[in-house]
Regions:
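Alpha-helical interface subdomain recognition
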Residues: 1-47, 56-57, 69-70, 74, ...
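A short, Trp-centered hydrophobic/proline-enriched beta-strand micro-motif
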Residues: 84-93
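Long, acidic (Asp/Glu-rich), low-complexity accessory segments flanking structured domains
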Residues: 184-202
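Glycine-rich phosphate/pyrophosphate-binding beta-alpha loops
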Residues: 46-49, 98-99, 125-131
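A short core secondary-structure module
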Residues: 116-162
Length: 303
């Protein structure tokens, strides 16, 4: 449960440029293509599950909502520090009564009388990176709007933000996972992401972009488990025979290798198709945001 180690390694990853692989160069990132970012996700996941989770939560849903939906001012203000690892991002969507039904969240955002800021109040749970995040992407409902709205919220304990204890998880013990409580947290109106009521769209599209990268993050673990299984089967003996020579073990290892190959093929075939569609849209004059979102949208089922 060494959360500080995860934070330190993440900061080092930022210094090496890994936290900005998906971020355009004009905002301090490397501007890599979709396939290259998938390869980085797979590579990083080979360290630990905790680092993989922290990395994915930061580079994906903790950063990309601003890259894809933020104003030019928001991107210039927040994205370079997120890409460098100076700041870390976290994504506050899930609530005690709003999981898969994300648009049913009860967190409220109330506009001040002078129209300069919103006061956000509510409870978020299972928030990855919450223990060391500097920036929260928060979703809240304004008045009785049908859909939630997204906000960029700096983590400031003096502004009504408190954290729950670290969750006692079955695995990924060094990945910070906490509840986040907002109590009349004041957020400037200029920190609204996109438009009022556009939060559910932002939330779902951000998850669409991140979902296939999560699959890539699982590939290295599949390969490592298969390799370890083969090694063990060649070492372990029963009935004076290495168990690798038993047909049942051969079948099991063959299935593991097949599953790894199929998963890898599906991930990189889909990611190359997405990259091709993004490039076509770029050449057609689409912005980075539109090209990225529309490219992923065309393969959302595969993702």
């Amino acid at each position: 449960k060494d959360y500080k180690l995860t934070e330190d390694v993440m900061r080092k990853a930022g210094e090496l440029g890994f936290l900005g692989v998906s971020v355009p160069e004009e905002y301090g990132g490397l501007g890599m293509g979709f396939v290259s970012t998938m390869l980085v996700c797979e590579y990083i996941s080979g360290c630990t599950g905790s680092l993989s989770t922290a990395f994915g939560a930061h580079t994906g849903i903790g950063t990309m909502p601003i890259v894809l939906y933020g104003t030019e001012e928001q991107k210039k203000k927040y994205v370079p520090k997120l890409a460098s690892g100076e700041h870390f991002g976290s994504y506050c969507l899930t609530e005690p009564t709003a999981g898969s039904d994300a648009n049913s969240g009860k967190t409220k955002a109330v506009l001040s009388n002078d129209g300069k800021y919103y006061s956000i109040s509510g409870q978020k749970m299972w928030i990855s990176n919450a223990g060391f995040a500097n920036i929260f992407i928060v979703f809240a409902r304004i008045e009785d709007d049908k859909n939630i709205t997204g906000f960029i919220v700096p983590n400031d304990p003096e502004n009504g933000i408190t954290l729950g204890e670290e969750e006692n998880k079955l695995g990924i013990h060094s990945s910070s996972t906490r509840q986040v409580f907002f109590n009349n947290t004041k957020v400037p109106v200029e920190n609204m992401l996109s438009e009022r009521g556009n939060g559910f769209k932002i939330a779902m599209n951000s998850l669409n972009v991140g979902r296939i990268k999560l699959a890539a993050a699982c590939l290295d673990a599949q390969k490592r488990v298969t390799k370890l299984g083969v090694q063990y089967a060649n070492e372990r003996e029963q009935f004076k025979t290495k168990i690798i020579d038993f047909e049942a073990i051969k079948e099991k290892i063959a299935q593991m290798a097949t599953d790894s190959y199929v998963g890898e093929s599906a991930c990189y075939r889909a990611s190359k198709d997405i990259e091709d569609r993004i490039n076509i849209r770029h050449k057609s004059g689409n912005s980075f945001q539109d090209a990225e979102l529309k490219g992923v949208e065309e393969y959302v089922i595969e993702c």
